[in-house]
Amino acid sequence: MYKPLPESLTIKTSGVHGLGLFADQKIMRGTNLGMSHLKLGDTLFRTPLGGFINHSNTPNVEKTVLLMVNEDKVKFDYKKWNLITLRDIKEGEEITIRYTFYNV
């Protein structure tokens, strides 16, 4: 079942920019925080998780991309970006990511 934010996160005023995502409790390294973006065809949708995360050059989460394959051979494109913690995150710490969709 889809939830806008995991129970371990909340939205608060950020020292980085505007609002940000913050840990309500300790989050262990390797935790899947959920879906941040979904691409259907040419349209990219941002979830609340993706909408409130701020940039950092030293992020504590990274994105993983899941590309769905349609075995019925009906034409569609489907990609899902999830956020995975790179290290243990302390309660009260802001969740950040490096803003890129590709590497150069």
Predicted regions and their residues:
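Conserved catalytic SET/PR domain of SAM-dependent protein methyltransferases, capturing the structural core
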Residues: M1-V104
